[in-house]
């Protein structure tokens, strides 16, 4: 089966059919050949099974896998590259380190799989990206959970993979450890040209890390597309969660040193956001996340108040939220998508309806790396 991607354009084509007594996976995915693709869904939706198929660890009754032009599986041609010959890195929920080896020896073990001439990630780069240079002489027993996971990720990178698979790498960590490790994962996203398939059931993780999103339900892909497009679809489950949010990319357009306020120009030209942050070069692209719970609506422009960001918006559609007392409202701010979660009482009091003009008051903006 030839690749379906245009000449010169990288991509991943993953088609798997897997049958178990009580579960089946049947997906046909066309994914970007770079950046982070998140597989999102409830437990039992098929996320890990899909990852195991990519790694060659699950029996596939019918399938095809092309990683940027390199075919690892083609059932029709009876071709299946064994797992140990697939240039992939696999990061599990808990790092499986060799307890009798120090961190440096664990990392060097990952490098042994790759001939020196084929290494695309070196030791200095991996330790720098994950911030573990000071841990090289430590034994695994002396590492925190977050440190162990960072070492495990670095070891996976040192195999110089063409594909990095990450199966809920933060699931075993407490909130503080997750906060510590997320910036390092964002650095991988920004600085390495390795496609990542990231399994998670955390909307916040997906919003911070992913470029592309695949939603799985009962072994089927119910939606696949750019993250910003799928996050605002009210017919999909992510918009119904307590952490429902949008991710917006803009450009730094000014800084007020007296108040430490950075201005972000949003796509479309007129809408801007301001938030407390350090200065950034003019024109630098930045990503921010805005949670639906932090957006309120008004019919008249608020003139006085403590909320910095008030944007003119158009109501696009509304849908019931997970909590029956609330509704989700999809908005357009001069081309920038937003979500608001408001009470049904507020909807009725404001008599909101599609195509109405309103004002969105954004209480909080979080900058992503």
UniProtKB/Swiss-Prot annotation:
The keyword Transport applies. InterPro entries: AAA+_ATPase (IPR003593), ABC_transporter-like_ATP-bd (IPR003439), ABC_transporter-like_CS (IPR017871), Mo/tungstate-bd_C_term_dom (IPR008995), ModC_ABC_ATP-bd (IPR011868), Molybdenum_import_ModC (IPR050334), Mop_domain (IPR004606), P-loop_NTPase (IPR027417). It catalyses: molybdate(out) + ATP + H2O = molybdate(in) + ADP + phosphate + H(+). Its main location: membrane. Keywords: ATP-binding, Cell inner membrane, Cell membrane, Membrane, Molybdenum, Nucleotide-binding, Translocase, Transport. SMART domains: AAA. Residues 304-369 form the Mop domain. It is a peripheral membrane protein. Residues 7-243 form the ABC transporter domain. Its EC number is 7.3.2.5. Disulfide bonds: none annotated. One of its GO terms (cellular component) is plasma membrane. Transmembrane segments: none annotated. It is found in: Cell inner membrane. Signal peptide: none annotated. It comes from the Bacteria. ATP binds at residues 41-48. Part of the ABC transporter complex ModABC involved in molybdenum import. Responsible for energy coupling to the transport system. Belongs to the ABC transporter superfamily. Molybdate importer (TC 3.A.1.8) family. PANTHER family: ABC TRANSPORTER I FAMILY MEMBER 10, MOLYBDENUM IMPORT ATP-BINDING PROTEIN MODC 2. The complex is composed of two ATP-binding proteins (ModC), two transmembrane proteins (ModB) and a solute-binding protein (ModA). This is Molybdenum import ATP-binding protein ModC. It comes from Bordetella pertussis (strain Tohama I / ATCC BAA-589 / NCTC 13251). The gene is modC.
